[in-house]
């Protein structure tokens, strides 16, 4: 299965009538493996900030999580495993696998829990596969 198929079929899938507004799978170095057409262009320093927070949990909290220049307030995640952010009625979930970052961006009517489930389920699967 191609990385694009993982994004299209497993991240941008419908859940309880809703779906993510954007999603991507990127390497730890910031290289884009696959993304939805709506995913924002990430800046290198944004990926560096995300990776730093996985290595030193809490480092993004004071400044916020930035994706494509959009700032998300960091909310409780799982230190070293999942970073969650909120912006108005929407937000983001970032799950770190062995080789990649899975990023899901959502907006109402999708809920934070639905976004977490979609992103983390695929992330857990990739971890089980050694990816």
Curated annotation (Swiss-Prot):
InterPro entries: PFN (IPR048278), PFN_euk (IPR005455), PFN_sf (IPR036140), Profilin_CS (IPR027310). It comes from the Eukaryota. SUPFAM superfamilies: Profilin (actin-binding protein) (SSF55770). CDD domains: PROF. GO terms for molecular function: actin monomer binding. Occurs in many kinds of cells as a complex with monomeric actin in a 1:1 ratio. Belongs to the profilin family. PANTHER family: PROFILIN, PROFILIN-2. This is Profilin-2. It comes from Malus domestica.
């Amino acid at each position: 299965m191609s990385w694009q198929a993982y994004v299209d079929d497993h991240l941008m899938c419908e859940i309880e009538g809703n779906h993510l507004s954007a999603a991507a799978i990127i390497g730890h170095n910031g290289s884009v493996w696959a993304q939805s057409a709506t995913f924002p262009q990430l800046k290198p320093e944004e990926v560096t900030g995300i990776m730093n927070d996985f290595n030193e949990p809490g480092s993004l909290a004071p400044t916020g999580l930035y994706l494509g220049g959009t700032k998300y307030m960091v909310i409780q995640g799982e230190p070293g495993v999942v970073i969650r952010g909120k912006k108005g009625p929407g937000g983001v979930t970032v799950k770190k696998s062995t080789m990649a970052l899975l990023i899901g961006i959502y907006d109402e009517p999708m809920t934070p829990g639905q976004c977490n489930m979609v992103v983390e389920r695929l992330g857990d699967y990739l971890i089980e596969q050694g990816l």
